[in-house]
Amino acid sequence: MAAKEKVAKETPLMKQYNEIKRKYPDACLLFRVGDFYETFGEDAIRASKILGITLTKRGAGSDTETALAGFPHHSINTYLPKLVKAGLRVAICDQLEDPKMTKTIVKRGVTELVTPGVSLNDEVLQSKTNNFLASVCFANKNIGISFLDVSTGEFLTAQGNAEYIDKLLQNFNPSEVLVPKNCKSEFKDAFGEDFHSFYLEDWIYKEDYALETLTKHFQTNSLKGFGVEELKEGIISAGAILYYLSETQHNRVQHITAIQRIAEDAYVWMDRFTIRNLELYHSYNPNAVTLLDVIDKTLSPMGGRLLKRWLALPLKDTNKIKGRHAVVSYLKSNPEILHNIQYQIKQISDLERLISKIAAGKVSPREIVYLKESLDAIIPIKTLALESPQEAVKVIGDSLHSCDLLREKIKTTLNQDAPVAISKGNAIATGVNEELDELRAISTSGKEFLEGIERRESERTGISSLKISFNNVFGYYIEVRNTHKDKVPEEWIRKQTLVNAERYITEELKEYETKILGAEEKIHKIESELFEQLVNWIATYIKPVQMNAYLVAQLDCLCSFTQMAVENQYVCPEIDDTFELDIKNGRHPVIEKQLPVGTPYIANDVFLDREKQQIIMITGPNMSGKSAILRQTALIVLLAQMGSFVPADSVRMGIVDKIFTRVGASDNISMGESTFMVEMNETASILNNISDRSLVLLDEIGRGTSTYDGISIAWAIAEFLHEHPSKAKTLFATHYHELNEMTESLPRIQNYNVAVKELKDTVLFVRKLVKGGSAHSFGIHVAKMAGMPQLVISKAQKLLKKLEKNHSSDALNGIKSANDEMQMSFFNLDDPLLEEIKEEILSLDINAITPVEALMKLNEIKRMLVKK
């Protein structure tokens, strides 16, 4: 009963608010009231904390008392980004009619739902970073995933196992992920809780619905033209994204012109561990420099975003890689052309996001002027590219669209100094619309206009004292003294008689009066209509502008590679069809930029092949530079296959299809996993996925457990890699100098060490990779350099001598004898039964088999052995 009374006492405004809020229960509702956006209840409490605005009460002391917090409507671009960045979905509820035109409560409705993954607001977006919305679809064997950046129109889809989808999520780093409600736990188990997720009804994730949604949007009969028709789960996830756009009131999305397949076999495989370990975009230390920080010399937002994509997806196609290298070589040899292209790229605004705003109808007059200026800057780039003898550059020049009609239309329609909002006025140029020009003349030069009429009528009638005036009763009128009454023309209409004069009105004055009183309102209306027409007309150029944006981004990335090569003395890598990796004087691209001025980076050679030196076993103490050598090898390969030059004297290499790293400590305590467990998970992932063109980098395997356990595990892993048919190229860094013994029985393992000079009381890290193993770890020396108390150092030295005396290499001999006895290699079996078991095991799909099926298979293998 009390609840009913409360409802009855709701004000009309709060009743309207509650009706709208019920439609958007999970969003923060910004409710337009007059000149303010207000929030109520729980929304107000959250908003006041996030925005730092005053929390007050509406209807204080009454039954309808509720929390209230608000801000001026013109501050929306200041406060909205803060709410979205805090992870909130924000529903913007505007007044849908002029309050002056209604006697009842103003009609209101949600005009836009802004979420972390769906926004066109410049303050929410980062210029050189895509703002992806992702959607995942779970099936029995595959997981589908799609990514959309509504601010640029990029729409991508893929499908695969959980590991592949995890890699894509790490690479694309979406701001928001859509998940079916019945798959909450599956998503959390597979990909963790780091993503901002939103759960959709399960019926949305149906193939028929997705196909209908996508074909309707693209206005096609099928999706064959996009090359995605076989990606069933990918298509379903993409359909959910388009559904979500319509739900968030983003219905004007004609800038989403295509959906592109992420071709797994076209790019180098890097799992999440590798992406993290190599510090491509993020570092363990928030203040540290990443590879992206070093290589990003792009000058446009589009170029910056594309460079991130190239870094995430290095190429495997030799011809495409060599094509990029050829452009960099050409630009490096022609510095003047490089400088001229870069100068023009600097003049180009964010074409992708500008044209997306035009499609959505959320663009300002000034932004359209920026669009025109950007297209102007493309003309000299096109000319330079067409004159180039380099074929790939010439193709870019040929493909760039000059957009002559579009540029001319904007030039003649808008003022060069157009305002940031159409409501500010003076956006449309003079000469576009006759009525607009006349209204402006009336509005800005009314006095001159009236003086002109006064002068003309005085000359026409011969009444020299004729005067035009204004009052609130008659409006504008002509006053004539009685001495000149006989000269008044017949068409003048008398309105008032005074003692010494008569007042008249004319049709012309009445028209002028009507015009001037409504001029400002009409000017705004005409300008808005003309601007809307212009925006709709420009929208027909979406595809050529998007193509221009992509081509400029490509050129920008290649110029960035060239700039980097010039500044840092990078060389062009030689790509061939061998399985070799031959680096002469390679350098770490990030570390060399962090060294003090004048300090040279110690360069190192690395050679790997499948015949003589498949595995390099690198020993040396901590701090000696082992990890840096591992990382720089991976980064050189990565840069080469991105199409960049590389930090070395020379590099010759066959294509690498997968890069695996297990580098440095990376506890996942939040997931309840220790260092050792994380290490074993990462290493297992590597061993289960290697190929004949893989590059494997292992650092300090086994250090998270006891010494003997660690040595045993490291030994077994190294032998597995050596004996595996793929013979994957491997760098294996360890401080277990016992592993140097492996070269005696495994011919493709070669020992190297990072040179250290032992001085009187300290060690000098030379950081040079030299052939041969290292017999000492120098751990106590490192502890001393770190400032450990002398008492601790002395005690450690005594204990070390005692341990070295008491513990010979018995443990190592035990490992070697076990090796001889058990034939640790599982790939050299002569027994037909064991060969059969080997085939059984190798044919198993670990990712697809259930625990019960695994036990049944194990029981089957046991029966085979018992029979024997």
Swiss-Prot record:
Entries under InterPro entries matching the protein: DNA_mismatch_repair_MutS, DNA_mismatch_repair_MutS-lik_N, DNA_mismatch_repair_MutS/MSH, DNA_mismatch_repair_MutS_C, DNA_mismatch_repair_MutS_clamp, DNA_mismatch_repair_MutS_core, DNA_mismatch_repair_MutS_N, DNA_mismatch_repair_MutS_sf
Cellular component annotations (GO), alphabetically ordered: cytosol
Binding site residues for ATP: 620-627
GO molecular function, one term: mismatched DNA binding
SUPFAM superfamilies: DNA repair protein MutS, domain I, DNA repair protein MutS, domain II, DNA repair protein MutS, domain III, P-loop containing nucleoside triphosphate hydrolases
Described purpose of this protein according to its UniProt entry: This protein is involved in the repair of mismatches in DNA. It is possible that it carries out the mismatch recognition step. This protein has a weak ATPase activity.
Organism: Flavobacterium johnsoniae (strain ATCC 17061 / DSM 2064 / JCM 8514 / BCRC 14874 / CCUG 350202 / NBRC 14942 / NCIMB 11054 / UW101) (Cytophaga johnsonae)
Keyword terms, alphabetized: ATP-binding, DNA damage, DNA repair, DNA-binding, Nucleotide-binding
Family annotation (PANTHER family): DNA MISMATCH REPAIR PROTEIN MSH1, MITOCHONDRIAL (PTHR11361:SF34), DNA MISMATCH REPAIR PROTEIN MUTS FAMILY MEMBER (PTHR11361)
Family: Belongs to the DNA mismatch repair MutS family.
Classification via Gene3D superfamilies: 1.10.1420.10, DNA repair protein MutS, domain I (3.40.1170.10), MutS, connector domain (3.30.420.110), P-loop containing nucleotide triphosphate hydrolases (3.40.50.300)
GO biological process: mismatch repair
Pfam family, one: MutS_I
Protein name: DNA mismatch repair protein MutS
